Amino acid sequence: MPLSTATLHILLALASEDRHGYGIMREVARQSDGRYKLGPGTLYDNLQKLLDQGIVEERSPRSLGDDPRRRYYRLSRFGRGLLATEIARLEGVVREARLHIKIRPERA
């Protein structure tokens, strides 16, 4: 089943490093060039579901000087596999769309 837009962005934000909630929101905005904004309610509702499903794990604060109330999240092994599967699915969708509407990939 396809991932929701919010879930996909959260997993992409966690793919490169562990992040706290605000860090996830900033990374989502950066990766999408500001086109997708993830609010706190959407973020934390989704994070709780991802934690419950074993897709994301909580970890201890990054360093001793870090605010102990700050919670850091990371992709689980299962979450990394799920993200890879979703990326492959989306690549297939784009490939199929290009065949049907005859769009050529842009060249840099």
Show the residue positions of the predicted features.
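Residue-level signal for threonine
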Residues: 4, 75-76
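N-terminal helix-turn-helix DNA-binding core of bacterial DNA-binding proteins
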Residues: 1-42
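Beta-hairpin "wing" of winged helix-turn-helix
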Residues: 51-68, 74
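Basic amphipathic alpha-helical segments that dock to polyanions
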Residues: 43-50
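Short, well-ordered turn and helix-capping elements at secondary-structure junctions
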Residues: 28, 32, 60-62, 77-79
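Amphipathic alpha-helical dimerization/coiled-coil segments
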Residues: 78-108
